[in-house]
């Protein structure tokens, strides 16, 4: 282990040296991606004076390339080479940064037909576990992405993800630390949309003109007049725009007209932040006044009063909160006030769009532990790059993770390094994965003793150390711990002695076992004989009896009278028709009448009546009475005037589309009803047919579970039992229950997860137009893209809290997890739904959209890479 520590220390020292080499005195990180090993690194880029270094020590994979020779002269040196990634789906740069410090991060991409195929690559760019942008290199001059972002850990991972047949590539990667307190947001990061200064002719301004190496592009329009000064302009506010940009300004040629910028958004409700920099650079006469207001689509943004420029000194208007154009067209204007004698002026303008990164990075201590484990064993796996847990489809192999709350860091719960050719002792770094539940190190060449720390890991429930060369004794702490411990195939390991039982006790146990087996066999045979003597269940139903004799029992003629001869149909189900009725003159009821052709019979009828007679909960439909007369069976229960949830989600029958807040409340109320069945009943019950059509709504849209014909009891919390028949509705049915026949409360949890996905997306559970794909498949695909707007029901018109939506979506997917052991209980579901509602009620991030692609608008300027 000392040698491993020495190697790790040497690697750490080497990394620090390379980080220092990649930084200049301003703390900049400038990487020339794909710089050949035979070229000098670091080198000074002649036009900017910036120090660029090779990217080789910041990434584990990729190959180097160079743009075609006939294109090299058009581009600066850092953009002539590139790194491309023919292997692996995700390839990531790992950069050391300061946690909670704001950085300007710029990534540049230039294809340059380096491979001679003349096929422009298309791929995704990720920041940690979140999608940053979609890269399409159709432009021969390349493209760039720039963002202002605050890392949540001391490690920043920038990843290129293959999405099709083409190969991802990158030309340069640059990080610039920004001044504390600048470019603040309510939430999210800022993606650069435009950064302009106003001059009729000019070149791109960046370092050393701009101390933060921001790129400023000249812009001017025919209806403007340029004013300039040769004097110095003080630019030392928190944003510190370049002085060269402030020595010129634009004013409208028509002094009474506004100074106007127009563009069209590619998406509705994009959120913007504006930073307008202005300084008075004209000599004003004694009676001259210049003041103006800043407006967006007619909304006055100068809420503290008109903007008044200072003589040769910068002022900056900044958005205090995100602003939307509320449509496709955006109209940003500076309008003079009535008392102003001069038109408005503007020296420079920055426009950013908000981009949300909702997914938290994997817990930092878990990530460090995995890196240390990898270093200890010399593991080199192509997919062990980027965030270990998310996106889910890119999760590191050998790992399982859990993440009940999207805003909290995911945790690693399972590590499987079986048959990985591991040598040495069991790595001490494993103990740093504090929520690890399963550890499999079997069939390697591990030596040494079983470490004491394994017995102190509270979450560990399964340890497999089979097939190694471990020695020594098993630690006392591990022997006392109640877990599954596999140690076979370790011949040098001293196993604890087996406890010997007295012969008399063994004999007694064997005798009792034989007696029990004989009794069970006898009882099964008797049950078979009795069952053979029973009459078919549908020959007559007059024998149906119920445990509760106090309920109202209707005659068939009373049912006819209550329903006015079955005049008004409310719906139809597997049981039969449901009719509207009235009892006691004014009390409205719903009457479910068993159809003679129904696939359900007296057994389901009796089950529903028995359950409704003994359960009483505000979120379960109440039974008024029943009819059992000859072959006529009917249930009479309370009438819920707003019908079922499915109708309202679809908008069928003129039903209104319910908003997001009400949907969350309905979900919570349905969950409360299920929780009562699971833990409030004796014995506990499972519903077995949870779906949107079985969630009914009263006049106040209060939710109540209905249709208990398939409900069954089970032994208790966390347990399951075999079900002789598989029942439920296709798409909502727990696949694990379907395959195993095991019935438990987690079967209802799965169905509830599907219901919640329906409420979130308004997508069909089974999409028959897409090869019968399931809703979980569609949602999983969209989640991996990171765009919540593509997932949410468009009928909601984006009127929801982004964080609340993400939390609900994560909860739904955890409920619908294939393995029932990984699903939450209904009590946990209720807790999470309450958190979602609380998050929604805060109003934070309301109407916040996600913007990934740079807009192609009339203010067009070329992003880096930049031609000479």
Swiss-Prot record:
GO MF annotation list: ATP binding; protein serine kinase activity; protein serine/threonine kinase activity; transmembrane receptor protein tyrosine kinase activity
SMART domains to which the protein is assigned, alphabetical: S_TKc
Cellular compartment(s): Cell membrane
Catalytic activity: L-seryl-[protein] + ATP = O-phospho-L-seryl-[protein] + ADP + H(+); L-threonyl-[protein] + ATP = O-phospho-L-threonyl-[protein] + ADP + H(+); L-tyrosyl-[protein] + ATP = O-phospho-L-tyrosyl-[protein] + ADP + H(+)
Membrane topology (Extracellular): 23-500
Positions of transmembrane segments: 501-521
Its job: Probable receptor with a dual specificity kinase activity acting on both serine/threonine- and tyrosine-containing substrates.
The protein's name in its UniProt record: Receptor-like protein kinase At5g59670
Organism field: Arabidopsis thaliana (Mouse-ear cress)
